[in-house]
């Protein structure tokens, strides 16, 4: 089994964890509808890069 040579200091531990933070997802605005969506994903209306790629589901308003 691997055994550490010396105890890891809090500084070294923090430096190792410095890249683990979550980042906000990059957002884009659909040019045709103005909807905000994640990059490389279709908008809620079914548009991607200015073209409608799928039909949006009709929502029942009750």
Swiss-Prot record:
GO cellular component: large ribosomal subunit
Single GO MF descriptor: structural constituent of ribosome
Keywords: Ribonucleoprotein, Ribosomal protein
Biological process annotations from GO: translation
Listed Pfam families: Ribosomal_L32p
Annotated spans, Disordered: 28-62
InterPro entries, per the entry: Ribosomal_bL32 (IPR002677), Ribosomal_bL32_bact (IPR044957), Ribosomal_zn-bd (IPR011332)
SUPFAM superfamilies (alphabetical): Zn-binding ribosomal proteins (SSF57829)
Protein family (similarity comment): Belongs to the bacterial ribosomal protein bL32 family.
Protein name: Large ribosomal subunit protein bL32
Source organism phylogeny: Bacteria, Pseudomonadati, Pseudomonadota, Gammaproteobacteria, Chromatiales
